[in-house]
C-alpha cells in the first residue's frame, strides 16, 4: 500500500464518523448508510424540446427499452404524444427518472407560458436535456438562459443525426458541419456551458457521434449521492465511466470492510478472526454488476466480436470470471469458498500495512485484523475486476471501433 493510499483511507474515516461508532456502538447502521444511501436518492432528468425532436426515443434508448410491448416504453411519434410531463423510471433504479416534457411552442404549451405552466414545474428537475433535431432556435436558447440564470444543470443535445448521415459518403465531415452549425447558434447565448452533443437514439454506438460522451456528461453534471445514483444505474460503460466507477467503488472499501468484520461474523477456519461472508459475497456481486463483468456481459461481448467466451477468456487473459463465483447463500459453504483466500490475505504484507495505517480502527474498535483482512481481500479482487472491465472495453474498441459498451 502506497502512502497516498494510506492517506486516502485515513481521510475516508472521518473523525465524526469514528466518534459515532465509538459512542453509539452502531457500526452496522453507519456502514450500511455509507454504502447504500445512493439507493434512496431521487434524480429527475427532464428532456425538453419541440414536438418531434426525439425526446421519447432518447428516453427509451438510455433505458434500453427497445419494444413497444414493454410496459414502460415511451410512446414515439412525429406528433405531440405528451400532454403532461411523464416520468419513466430507469429499470435498474426506479428513483432515476427520465421526464418526457410536453413539446415547446405547441398550442397548449406556448413558449411565453411554458415556464410558468403549473403542469410543467419547470424548475423542479435536477438535470435538463435541451434537445433539437435540426438547428437550435431562439426557443432552446431562451430556456437554456433561464436555466443558467437559476443555476440549473443543462445539456444541449442535437438528436436524430442518423437521418442527416443517411447516404452520406464522408460521415465525419457531415458530423463536423452539423456540430459547427449547432455551436454557432449556442454561442450567441449568454450561457456558460455551450457544448453540444450529437446523438442518434437508434445508433448509440455510432463512431462519429456523442452518445458515449453524453452518458459521461450526465454523470459529471451530477454531484454527491445523485452522482453515485446516476453512475451506478446507467447501463453503459465507457473508458471514463469505468475509471469513475473505480474511484467510487474504492471509496466504499472502508465501509464494506467494516461491515464484513462486524456484521453476523463467523470464525474463519484455522484463523483467529471472524468475517461476514455474506457481506463480502454481496459486495463482490455488486462489483461485477457495476463494472459489467457478469457472465451475461461476457456472452454479449462474445456475440458482438464473433468469438467464443472461452476464446475471449484465454486470448485476453480475463481473470475474474472463473474465481469467486457465488454458487450458494449457505454461510458454511460460503466460508469454504472464501477461507483459503482469506487465510492467504491474513498472512500477507498488505494486511500488516493496512493495520498499521489504520491504528485508530484497530485499537478503538477491537477487530482490526478482521477488518483489515476483509478490506484487503475486497480491494485485491476489486482491482482484478477493474482490470477485466478495462480489458473487455479494449476488446470492444479493438474489434468494433465502438466506444460504448452496454452492460446487463
Residue ranges and their predicted role:
Residues 76, 97-113, 156-159, 164, ...:
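AAA+ P-loop NTPase catalytic core and its hallmark functional loops
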Residues 123-127, 150-154, 191-195:
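Short glycine-/polar-rich loops that comprise or flank the Walker A/P-loop
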